Amino acid sequence: IAIVACGTAYHAGMVGKYALESLTRLPVWVDLSSEFRYRNPLVSRDTLVIAVSQSGETADTLAAVREAKKKGATIVSVCNVVGSSLTRESNFVFYTLAGPEIGVASTKAYTAQLLMFYMLALEIGRIRKTLPSGFYAQALKTLNRLPILQSQVLKKKKLVEAIAQRHHHFGSFLFLGRNVNYPSALEGALKLKEISYIPAEGYAAGEMKHGPIALIDEYRAVVCIAVAS
């Protein structure tokens, strides 16, 4: 399985890789759409290419899909806009149907893309019998609780405002995450740059000691994503 996407959708694809490999035991790689077609990728009739785009009109992703189709790959798109160019180029389509993104940044579409990847991984894992006993039913219950959990997070607006007030003066930010939280670190850095115009980087937590630590000082804030430990 190959996943191609740009920007926020690329980060969703990275999470998708973790989910698909973990639950289906199939090899998955993720490529930036803008790089995919320039390296003569190893794609064949046995390759499933999953193209992710909120709008379905991302030029680089469309070009990557056309390159994969030339090589005989089957194309599945994860898209938010019905009837967009990407969906017309695809063999199969998963519509996220998250509604239009009002701001520049992709937010609810990103969340829907993550959910779509987990659902796909669960279904393939169920068919391939690679899931632990009882995992499928428990995972569906957990996913169905997401709207409640998200609403609880949104109620923390005052806490978020207080944290922003304490940290808005920092000149740059470093976001750190490990495993499935690494793409979230990249996404957090992208969102801060996109919306607040503050320089930010996302790194795998274990890589901090291999360079980025040299830039840590009193002018740089560090955000650690450690949701379970």
What do the PLM-derived regions correspond to, one by one?
Residues 2, 82, 92-221:
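Active-site phosphate/pyrophosphate-binding segments
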Residues 219, 228-229:
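NAD(P)-dependent dehydrogenase/reductase Rossmann-like domain
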Residues 2-145, 225-228:
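Glycine-rich phosphate-binding loops that contact phosphosugars or nucleotide phosphates
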